[in-house]
Amino acid sequence: MGSSNSVCVGIDDVAIHFPRLYMDMKDFADLRGEDYGKLNKGLGLKAMSIPDVHEDTATMGANAVMKLIDRNGLNPKNIGRMYLGTESALDGAKPTATYIVDMLTQRYSERYGADCFRNCDVVDMTFACIGAVDAMHNTLDWVARSTDEDERIGIVIFSDNAKYALESAGEYTQGAGGGAILIRRNPRLLEIPDIIGVSTTPVHDFFKPRREVSVKSIISNVMTLAQEAGQSIKKGIVERMIRHLPASTVRKSVSYTHLRAHETASD
């Protein structure tokens, strides 16, 4: 990459997986009072994919990789790395890519052996919207070191389950899905030259997932559901219920900031 003596590397194939459940953007626009033309023609939004109860970042990524392997007749033992770009990791320490590899191993172990992915390097890359781009740059560099005796094959996975607060400004941009990109020498789809510009600057972004939930929000949601079911709820009942909860319950269920605010109000 980058000179006349460089090897040609790039994208050889792409596979995509979306959940079967979705919400039509016309229905969403009607529900939220949004301009459907803006969402559909302005932003190109047609539907909002929704993970089923058995789906998450790992399963969507695994399904995409499975399509890629089956369509190209790849032997898992020849796949040297699978790097995942995601903002929706399942674990704070264990890479979500390891969950993907575990599922793929279960699928292909009977044909290729229980250790078919044993020598495959996996890692998660998190950097807002460009995690998978960084994963691809790293994989391109790695594949570029291929030789005739050592043909390197890498897969870049991208998978996310984007969720925003109800009725928030970004709600209509949420959705879920995964994909897998096959990186190898002499690609059929797209050669990517070694001409890459880099610019990094710290900016504020949103943080997820939320690590705390207030007792008040839990009880309030339950009361709202009860009202929708036709129950009569007395005014101020949420606050009265919180006051009668054991102190240990409050400490375990709210963040330190919420607890201090409650103590100050009580004083």
PLM features: what roles do these ranges have?
Residues 76-94, 100:
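Membrane helical hairpin/interfacial module
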Residues 1-54, 171-256:
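Condensing-enzyme catalytic core mediating Claisen C-C bond formation in acyl metabolism
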Residues 64-79, 249-259:
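Phosphate/pyrophosphate-binding loops at sites that engage ATP/ADP/AMP, CoA/4′-phosphopantetheine
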Residues 70-80, 107-121, 143-157, 266:
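Structural signature of cysteine-dependent C-C bond-forming condensing enzymes
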Residues 258-267:
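Single conserved hydrophobic/aromatic residue that forms the stacking wall/gate
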Residues 95-110, 140-145, 170-175:
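A glycine- and small-aliphatic-rich helix-loop capping segment at beta-alpha/alpha-beta transitions
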Residues 123-151, 173-174, 181-187:
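Active-site-proximal alpha-helical scaffold in enzymes
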Residues 85-91, 126-131, 158-163, 186:
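Acidic, glycine-rich active-site loops and adjacent beta-strand->loop/helix elements
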